[in-house]
Amino acid sequence: GSSGIIPFPRV
C-alpha cells in the first residue's frame, strides 16, 4: 500500500 522505499501490500 505504500510507495516508499519498501512497498507494503494492502492487507
UniProtKB/Swiss-Prot annotation:
Cell compartment(s), UniProt: Secreted
Tissue: Expressed in abdominal perisympathetic organs and abdominal ganglia.
Keyword entries, A-Z: Amidation, Neuropeptide, Secreted
An example Gene Ontology CC term for this record: extracellular region
Primary location group: secreted
InterPro entries for the chain: Periviscerokinin
Modified residues (Valine amide): 11
Single GO BP term: neuropeptide signaling pathway
Pfam families, sorted: Periviscerokin (PF08259)
UniProt family annotation: Belongs to the periviscerokinin family.
Functional note: Mediates visceral muscle contractile activity (myotropic activity).
Name of protein: Periviscerokinin-3
Organism from which the protein derives: Aptera fusca (Cape Mountain cockroach)
Lineage of source species: Eukaryota, Metazoa, Ecdysozoa, Arthropoda, Hexapoda
